[in-house]
Design a protein with these regions (language model features):
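Generic structural signal for well-ordered, non-membrane alpha-helical segments
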Residues: 8, 33, 37, 108, ...
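C-terminal cap of metal-dependent C-N hydrolases
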Residues: 61-112, 116
Length: 130
């Protein structure tokens, strides 16, 4: 799914939604968190005919996200995979094809403040018809 048919491009949120919809229609045990994650990763890659991604293995393309789950909101969570669908939304560290692009919650590849200012200017111009 993407911005053409949805209001966000968040793979984790889509996996969670798929799991919840299965549970509403087919019962609480209809889809586990692990099944939802596999559907979102391996399943998505398989649908696209991409054997080079969708899994963490030698030779596969990979983007790796790391969340800090040491906070009180994650305390007592017994299923660590469930944290992916219900845990923190802000990534601590992010690697895209081996290159770190977020470190300790901060984007490392561009100046976020400048990007926000530019976006605000462009949005204002668009709304003003300039």
């Amino acid at each position: 799914d993407g911005s053409a048919s949805n209001d966000a491009g968040n793979l984790i949120a889509e996996a969670r939604q798929a799991m919840l919809l299965q549970r509403v229609v087919n019962g609480a045990d209809a889809m586990s968190v692990r099944e939802a994650l596999e559907l979102a990763t391996r399943g998505g890659a398989n649908v696209l005919g991409r054997s080079d991604c969708g899994r963490i293995s030698i030779g596969s393309r990979a983007d790796i996200a790391i969340w800090d789950v040491s906070g009180v909101e994650s305390a007592g969570s017994w299923d660590k995979s469930a944290l992916l669908l219900s845990g923190p939304t802000t990534v601590r560290d992010l690697f895209v094809e081996g290159r770190q692009v977020v470190r300790e919650g901060q984007i490392t590849t561009f100046n976020l403040g400048e990007a926000i200012a530019l976006q605000s200017t462009l949005a204002r111009q668009l709304c003003d018809g300039n």
